[in-house]
UniProtKB/Swiss-Prot annotation:
The gene is eno. (2R)-2-phosphoglycerate binds at residues 167, 342, 371-372, 393. This is Enolase. NCBIfam families: eno. PROSITE patterns: ENOLASE. It is found in: Cytoplasm; Secreted; Cell surface. Mg(2+) binds at residues 246, 290, 317. It comes from Erwinia tasmaniensis (strain DSM 17950 / CFBP 7177 / CIP 109463 / NCPPB 4357 / Et1/99). GO terms for molecular function: magnesium ion binding; phosphopyruvate hydratase activity. Catalyzes the reversible conversion of 2-phosphoglycerate (2-PG) into phosphoenolpyruvate (PEP). It is essential for the degradation of carbohydrates via glycolysis.
Length: 431
């Protein structure tokens, strides 16, 4: 009953108005899985390739008809007749057929959409929710947890048209007892932040991930206005709410220095920027920093891990790009202590699960993440619960492409009850 009978690819639109790939996988018995590939703005150079058409007369070159053609042609042909429940085999067939190191023939966007759609179809055929099927694929059947959200309430860097260098300033509602309560706390702080910004004559326009994108006097000012909003919402910083940042430092790494426009174009060495971040962690309860240096600055990361790694979570995103080969090298060299998981960086569900397992086996944490270009597809919510990853990044409290994931988590928590504990701050490395 789980044999694939039809695969359909189509070009749809993501949250930035750019095209992306959606795939439908149909099984015997009428079961269907539907999934869409997300798309990043600040991308690691070693990510699997997102195939775009490059035809400037259509969608400014960002069309995905080549990737969709791969889904409807060679991929559909190769997986039709195969068992969708055998995820590893489905993914291997596509990866082998593509035959490139970075999925550049068909595009990671094509392969991932089919990979996720196959998983959803298989879950339907088994008569179980996707998170339950993922737990079985992960070799951890029946083991679930609700993730602690990192809510990106101030957007900067590549995610916003403002003067803030650091890409994401996030709150973690660690005082919550449930995911649903964490969402409520996040919402209350988000709305209070709007009031704080308005009172200072600042913009409340939002960036790609639904957080506010004001122009600020410095990067530290972003933390200061968040602290004000937390207090205004009736919560205590450090007790009810902790902070996290994604520096996306590769985006302001120029000629071996970290050049911060928001700090008067000051240039920092790796060591100096590490101490700049360390100073911020002394002023505010920052418990997690992502991509605190450039993806190629491994010596700098070794230093940063030595200075900060036993105190806070250091997450590798552009650094590791959800790739087990690169992650293994990082683990062997003691670089960072956590990995960001974005399944379009690697391009299949099987490889994503392998990266999560490798991280956990090494004592690293795994943070499940959206991309800045998203759709209504909420698969990452099921991925976070089904792997008991413990943490999720899926944006702020606005934009339905972000909120779709929180709403799916609320539904899952309701369905699982105490089978899926919400562990809060205990999920964060070093806390």
């Amino acid at each position: 009953m789980s044999k694939i009978v039809k695969v359909i690819g189509r070009e749809i639109i993501d949250s930035r108005g750019n095209p992306t790939v959606e795939a439908e996988v149909h099984l015997e018995g009428g079961f269907v899985g539907l999934a869409a590939a997300p798309s990043g703005a600040s991308t690691g150079s070693r990510e699997a390739l997102e195939l775009r058409d490059g035809d400037k007369s259509r969608f400014l070159g960002k069309g995905v008809t080549k990737a969709v053609g791969a889904v409807n042609g060679p991929i559909a042909e190769a997986v039709t007749g195969k068992d969708a429940k055998d995820q590893a085999n489905i993914d291997k067939i596509m990866i082998d057929l593509d035959g490139t190191e970075n999925k550049s023939k068909f595009g990671a966007n094509a392969i991932l959409a089919v990979s996720l759609a196959a998983a959803k179809a298989a879950a339907a055929a088994k008569g179980m929710p996707l998170y339950e099927h993922i737990a079985e694929l992960n070799g951890t059947p029946g083991k679930f947890s609700m993730p602690l959200p990192m809510m990106n309430i101030i957007n900067g860097g590549e995610h916003a048209d403002n003067n803030v260098d650091i890409q994401e300033f996030m709150i973690q509602p660690v005082g919550a007892k449930t995911l649903k309560e964490a969402v409520r706390i996040g919402s209350e702080v988000f709305h209070n932040l709007a009031k704080v910004l308005k009172s200072k004559g600042m913009s409340t326009a939002v960036g790609d991930e639904g957080g506010y994108a004001p122009n600020l006097g410095s990067n530290a000012e972003a933390l200061a206005v968040i602290a004000e909003a937390v207090k205004a919402a009736g919560y205590e910083l450090g007790k009810d709410i902790t902070l996290a940042m994604d520096c996306a430092a590769s985006e302001f790494y120029k000629d071996g220095k970290y050049v911060l426009a928001g700090e008067g174009n000051k240039a920092f060495t790796s060591e100096e920027f590490t101490h700049f971040l360390e100073d911020l962690t002394k002023q505010y309860p920052i418990v997690s920093i992502e991509d605190g240096l450039d993806e190629s600055d491994w010596d700098g990361f070794a230093y940063q891990t030595k200075v900060l790694g036993d105190k806070i979570q250091l997450v590798g995103d552009d650094l590791f790009v959800t790739n087990t080969k690169i992650l293994k090298e990082g683990i062997d060299k003691g670089i960072a202590n956590s990995i960001l998981i974005k399944f379009n960086q690697i391009g299949s569900l099987t490889e994503t699960l392998a990266a999560i397992k490798m991280a956990k086996d090494a004592g690293y944490t795994a943070v499940i993440s959206h991309r800045s270009g998203e759709t209504e597809d909420a698969t990452i919510a099921d991925l976070a619960v089904g792997t008991a990853a413990g943490q999720i990044k899926t944006g702020s409290m606005s934009r339905s492409d972000r909120v779709a994931k929180y709403n799916q988590l609320i539904r899952i928590e309701e369905a699982l009850g105490n089978r899926a504990p919400f562990n809060g701050l205990k999920e964060v490395k070093g806390q």
